[in-house]
Regions:
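N-terminal Rossmann-like NAD(P)+-binding domain of SDR-like oxidoreductases, especially those catalyzing
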Residues: 1-191, 241, 323, 331, ...
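C-terminal substrate-binding subdomain of Rossmann-fold SDR/epimerase-dehydratase oxidoreductases
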Residues: 4, 17, 24, 30, ...
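Short histidine/acidic/glycine/proline-rich micro-motifs that form metal-
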Residues: 36, 190-193, 223-224, 291-292
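Residue-level signature of the cytosolic catalytic core of signaling kinases
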Residues: 41, 145, 194-198, 256, ...
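Short aromatic-enriched loop/helix-cap "lid" or pocket-rim segments at secondary-structure transitions
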Residues: 42-45, 143-146, 196-199, 263-265, ...
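Residue-level recognition of oxygen-bearing side chains
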Residues: 66, 97, 104, 197-201, ...
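Proline-centered turn/helix-capping motifs that create local helix->coil transitions or kinks
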Residues: 121-123, 141-145, 180, 196, ...
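The catalytic Tyr-centered alpha-helix of NAD(P)H-dependent dehydrogenases
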Residues: 146, 157-164, 194, 198, ...
């Protein structure tokens, strides 16, 4: 039986990964660590809380004693780090929080893994161990009208968020280059799907449109993103963990490039038709001042992961957006719970008077 220590398990991608793995594998143990900050939600794991293969621990990846104890107690074969502050707008207002979680937290995980897995005298690592860092295409910066990010593209982050993720990636590489730590890094394009906190575009649109609230769009809305359905991403992480070549970086993209304004109008049309609600229309769109340092285009070349591991994105945007909207419409209580209290204060801070 393989054991995974999964950090950030109650967040968007982490919780989807936990569901994916438990559905795919019978003989598995997932030790799931999450601090349960604003975007970490135990409701994301509610349907598996009685599954004996799933062990939840509330805690901080910066807590060296806790992480050390978990590795010693459960002896994980893989440590997969999803834990991160991930919203660019928040990073612009509070960059220090992103340094603590994304950089120092990653370094602590690496050091704890090294302490448990590395024999310094023999300069050898325990067999069958691997650290996997889940990263983002934003570490590469922005693209022009043509071309794609490749694993060899230089890192050129533009926001405090992407700078923190790039720094974490470099520490993972440094532990591999310095100590020989077995590791992989995955860099994904923009994920969407169930359990995504509504500070991100698609769930924000769904939540606002249902209430006939304005739909804020940064600038002209022509920023291009490569949409990746979250379960396709989970499959890629599983394949990299179990088959990725040691020390390699793998780009994970959906080949679903769309301008933000196209996504906005698609969500409006879907909700209008589904709910038969004349109040949901493009008149709700409100263009707001563009984000500082807003990257114009992202696009990933996933050739390497296809050739090395046989992964490919199975979900076109036209299917994925329907699955996503269906999920949010079927889970109104989830949305109501996560948008209460502090979320309203955050929303007003981000979009009021823009």
């Amino acid at each position: 039986m393989k054991t995974y220590l999964v950090t950030g398990c109650a967040g968007f991608i982490g919780s989807n990964f936990v569901h994916y793995m438990l559905e795919k594998y019978e003989d598995i143990r997932l030790v799931n660590l999450d601090k349960l900050t604003y975007a970490g939600n135990l409701e994301n794991l509610q349907d598996i809380e009685d599954d004996a293969r799933h062990i939840f621990v509330q805690g901080d990846i910066c807590d060296k004693a806790l992480v050390t104890d978990l590795i010693a107690k459960y002896d994980p074969d893989y440590v997969i780090n999803f834990a991160a502050e991930s919203h660019v707008d928040r990073s612009i207002k509070n960059p220090e929080i992103f340094v603590e979680s994304n950089v120092l937290g990653t370094v602590n995980l690496l050091q704890c893994c090294k302490d448990a897995w590395y024999d310094a005298a023999a300069k050898t690592w325990k067999e069958g161990k691997k650290y996997l860092q889940v990263s983002t295409d934003e570490v590469y910066g922005a693209l022009g009208a043509e071309g794609y990010f490749m694993e060899t593209t230089p890192l050129c982050p533009h926001s405090p968020y992407s700078a923190s993720k790039a720094s974490a990636d470099m520490f993972v590489k440094a532990f591999h280059d310095t100590y020989g730590m077995p590791m992989n890094i995955t860099r994904c394009s923009n994920n969407y799907g169930p359990y995504q906190f509504p500070e991100k575009l698609i769930p924000l649109l769904i939540n606002n449109a249902k209430q006939h609230k304005t739909l804020p769009v940064y600038g002209d809305g022509m920023q291009i993103r490569d949409g990746l359905y979250v379960m396709d991403h989970c499959k890629a992480i599983d394949m990299v963990a179990n088959g990725g070549k040691d020390g390699e970086v793998y780009n994970v993209g959906g080949h679903n490039e769309r301008p933000n304004i196209f996504i906005v109008k698609t969500v409006i049309a879907q909700l209008h038709d589904r709910l038969k609600d004349e109040g949901i229309s493009e008149e709700l769109i409100t263009h707001v001042a563009d984000r500082l340092g807003h990257d114009r285009r992202y696009g990933i070349d996933p050739t390497k992961i296809k050739e090395d591991l046989g992964w490919y994105p199975e979900t076109p945007f036209e299917k994925g957006i329907v699955l996503t909207i269906d999920w949010y419409l079927a889970h109104p209580d989830w949305m109501a719970h996560v948008t209460s209290g502090d979320y309203q204060k955050y929303y007003e801070q981000m979009y009021k008077n823009k």
